[in-house]
Amino acid sequence: MFSQNICMWRDCFARCSPGYYERFECFHDCITKGYDDGNCVPGPKTGRCCCTR
């Protein structure tokens, strides 16, 4: 069975990049798209921006 955290992630779209596209930009883009939250998954250096409801 899948972890609840894995099932929560719905839309991953942009590569996170320190100094260019970080958690703040990811969060802003997710809110603009109508999601409740957004974060770089699995981390800020190698992750992608994933939005959750």
Swiss-Prot record:
The keyword Nuclease is assigned to this record: no
Keywords: Antimicrobial, Disulfide bond, Fungicide, Plant defense
Disulfide bond entries: 12-51, 16-40, 26-49, 30-50
Domain of life: Eukaryota
Classification via InterPro entries: Defensin-like_dom
Biological processes annotated in GO: defense response to fungus; killing of cells of another organism
Protein family membership: Belongs to the DEFL family.
Name of the molecule in the record: Putative defensin-like protein 53
Protein's organism: Arabidopsis thaliana (Mouse-ear cress)
